[in-house]
Amino acid sequence: MKILISDKMSDKVEDVLKSKQIDYDIKTGMSPEELKGVIDQYDGILIRSATKLTSDILADCKNLKVIGRAGVGVDNVDLDQATKNRILVMNTPLGNLEATAELSVGLMFSIMRNIH
């Protein structure tokens, strides 16, 4: 299995892939044309918000099996095209739950103490 990481990710992602002996490439900042040219060389792709997987990019994918979205939404993935190509799309809706809770509590303290 070979994975493309197309957006910046935590170092923990690389640690997990290495521990599972999964081959991966990190190619961030690619243009849509560059991504379209390389995406079908991979079994999976890990993305965040910066990478947009449009129908044009996904249309000719015959090898891609899974799209992993680090984050809540999948609005940057053309789900109809992924479904047509039988590509599994997954996200991590609870991935930033703790950080969101910490920010919320911090903002409450800020409001209570009139800190701007």
Walk through the language-model features, giving the residues of each.
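N-terminal glycine-/charge-rich "phosphate-binding" loop or analogous flexible N-terminal tail
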Residues: M1-Y42
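Phosphate/diphosphate ligand-binding glycine-rich loop within oxidoreductases
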Residues: I5, G44-H116
